[in-house]
Amino acid sequence: MCLILAIDKPDDVFPAQLLTTSLAVRYDIMTKKRIFLFLCAGLIQSVSAQTISIPTDAQQAAKRVRPEAIEAHMRYLSDDKLQGRKPGTPGFELAAQYVEKQFTELGFKPAGQKGGFRQAVPLRKAQVRDEGSTMALIQDGSTRQLTYGKNFFLSPNYNAAISEVSAPVVFVGFGVSAPELGYDDYAGVDVRGKIVACFNGAPSTFPSNQRAYSNSAKQEVAATRGAIGIITFSLPTDVSARIESNAPRNRQATYRWTDANGQAQRTYSQLKVIASMGDETARSLFAKADKTFEEARLTANKNQPQSFPLNISAQARTQTEITDGLIGENIIGLLPGTDPKLKDEYVVYVSHLDHLGITRPIKGDSINNGAHDNASGVSINLEAARLFSTLPKKPRRSILFVALTGEEMGLLGSDYFASNPTVPKDKIVANLCLDMPFFFHPLLDIVPYGSEHSSMKGAVEAAAKFVGVQIAQDPIPEQSVFMRSDHFSFVRQGIPAIYVKSGSTTGDDRNGTKLNLDWRATIYHTPQDDMNQPFDWTAAARHVQLQFLIGYLTAQANDRPVWNAGDFFGTKFGSKASVK
């Protein structure tokens, strides 16, 4: 909460939006004057942002942006001959060669492995074999065999072709442990050696990002608490999470990257079964528990922690087809810094180069060109790199540009690089990500995801002011956009990150957020995401200027960015940034 002591000053001294969202307490002062004394961290950051100036050289470089260059990059990267840029295909290789050529022409140095631009990302493909995968419920000596695809689905085990388990089942509410938010379903329950069962989702009282993170961390939390399996199922109101809705996706192969020891990452080998269960089957788990399914649902709807034994056991066998040998590649270019002390620190730009490749035809087309997703982000970052190359004096800190692989497989290229960077991890000070920035209308306002979490907000505000765009609030907080692209891989490593998206203002009667949501509903991840779309190249150029200036100001600052005091993600991950 912000405390404002209200005392007379001109209205334009402080941002109006802060005045409308802060708690004001008026004090009559003996002089009968009123001065505003703002006692909150958010305002301190805003005021400090006003002191950030953009040097003339950087201003001039920003004005040299070329919209036609962005378009040319996009046209090549989304051409049919690249066949959708799926990792491991000739099309992705053509895209990688193109990015390497651009880095070379701009004077960027190779920053990959073995003196080249590339970093190999070893990938493992895993897919559950239906015919060899089973699940049964055991209660009072009676066994009920379940039907795969009707009653349940299993997730692949990335580290074992056959995984078997039989254990009692304990219900743990949402399966969330967040004591920092005053909530812990695991408090007072011992789940060691047991299978936990829980609802999908997280308490609705959590802020949107914390809620999304808590939902995504269920497996990790269960494994940390000693569980040997996890079963999830949806609340009756959560149609999107039901296994019937996700049946096609549940049958697809999935991927993880592997470490030097051949272990798949972001997996938890102690979890011998990871299952999702249909509504009717989930209800049957509570048949002889102390609470019914309906009582547990009501408790969850009240956002109250809960846990209790279900007095039932589950037996499961997961058969997984595991395929190794696929190598993705990140493409990494370096612009060395110029400050003797700061040149060994790095500001990292990322955008994913990969897309979906060739899939089933839609409207007679089977090539997923990925013009907006994400030839647009790569092209904007390439033009931002060109602006850096035109500076008469390069930034104090070094700049890395990374064209990533494996985003469409689950942020794999960024997670691999952030976990295994080609520069010292503790020297990476900030990340800027661009993924589908959405320039189908004039760019009049932006949503800079991540700026609310760290001191990078100052650089964002200064850049936005120069470019002439307003900073808007997140119009779709329920979508948890902050966790849904490659920048979050850096957040997981404790590195502050910014992810800029276009806002809702279009300058006419259209609403940018509605345009975006409609696009996602009709064009996203289809072959129709090609160059036959109404791109606004002036808006794209403004995205370039923003990317360039935010990174430039971060690279020039005396101090590296820091997480805001008490920030959820800074508290959870910030300590990792100091690990080499």
Located regions from the model:
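N-terminal hydrophobic or amphipathic helices/low-complexity stretches enriched
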Residues: 49-112, 344, 579-580
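Metal-dependent peptidase/peptidase-like ectodomains
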Residues: 146, 260-293, 404-509, 513-515, ...
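His/Asp/Glu-rich mid-to-C-terminal helical/loop segments that flank catalytic regions of hydrolases
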Residues: 386, 390, 504-573
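Extracellular/luminal Protease-associated
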Residues: 147-265, 336, 369, 373
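Second-shell loop/turn segments in exported
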Residues: 56-64, 80-90, 156-160, 181-184, ...
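Soluble metallo-hydrolase cores and metallopeptidase-like ectodomains found primarily
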Residues: 53-58, 140, 151-183, 266-370, ...
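Acidic/histidine-rich catalytic neighborhood of metal-dependent amide-processing enzymes
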Residues: 213-217, 238, 357, 363-455, ...
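Noncatalytic luminal/extracellular "stalk/propeptide" segments of secretory-pathway proteins
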Residues: 80-196, 200-203, 328, 455
